[in-house]
């Protein structure tokens, strides 16, 4: 903190902070003291929560049930996305079971498209295990989390959802045991 000096001639009567004080004054009333802000300021925050267990027993994409929407204030804005869900994967028999969760977005009503990851096999099936036993259930439980920065280049409403998928007709449950699933959205100014 810089040293603040008050002139001795100003010690009686009122002190004029613009002419009788030198140095840096602390910000009053909890302010930051900043006179301008650089790009990257958070402009708005929205979120969506969901607490009903979703079970996917097909090899198709399935909407988990959670959604959140945000309308960017400028085409140059970015959206910082965090998402998480409790999952449980189960299989009976000798097999390799793989599954995953991905973030999908709908820009201005144009339909949902996957925006998370590059689509590689390892990224798409981020959860998995191999079961060598037959007739015995194998189960893996955990918390899937993701965060990413997305550039929608629009001022139209953007809605986000999570989709689950797996490679077989086994069970992949999300929002497992009704533990809340979240999507949090923050508009970051350019």
Question: Which residues fall in each region the model found?
Answer:
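Extended, low-complexity regulatory regions
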Residues: 66-68
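Glycine-rich, low-complexity segments
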Residues: 1-53, 190
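Terminal beta-strand-rich extracellular "head" domains
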Residues: 48-49, 54-55, 60, 71-157, ...
């Amino acid at each position: 903190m810089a040293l603040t000096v008050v002139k001795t001639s100003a010690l009686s009567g009122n002190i004029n902070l613009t002419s009788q004080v030198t140095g840096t004054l602390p910000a009053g009333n909890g302010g930051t003291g900043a006179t301008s802000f650089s790009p990257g300021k958070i402009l708005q925050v929205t979120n969506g929560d969901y607490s009903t267990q979703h079970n996917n027993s097909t090899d198709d994409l399935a909407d988990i049930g959670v959604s959140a929407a945000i309308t960017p204030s400028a085409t140059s804005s970015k959206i910082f996305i965090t998402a998480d869900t409790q999952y449980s994967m189960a299989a009976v028999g000798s097999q390799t079971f793989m599954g995953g969760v991905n973030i999908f977005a709908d820009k201005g009503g144009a339909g949902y498209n996957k925006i998370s990851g590059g689509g590689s096999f390892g990224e798409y099936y981020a959860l998995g295990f191999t079961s060598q036993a037959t007739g015995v259930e194998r189960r893996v439980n955990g918390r899937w989390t993701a965060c990413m920065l997305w550039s929608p280049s629009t001022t139209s409403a953007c809605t986000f959802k999570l989709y689950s998928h797996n490679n077989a007709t086994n069970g992949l449950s999300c929002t497992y045991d009704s533990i809340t699933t979240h999507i949090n959205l923050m508009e970051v100014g350019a």
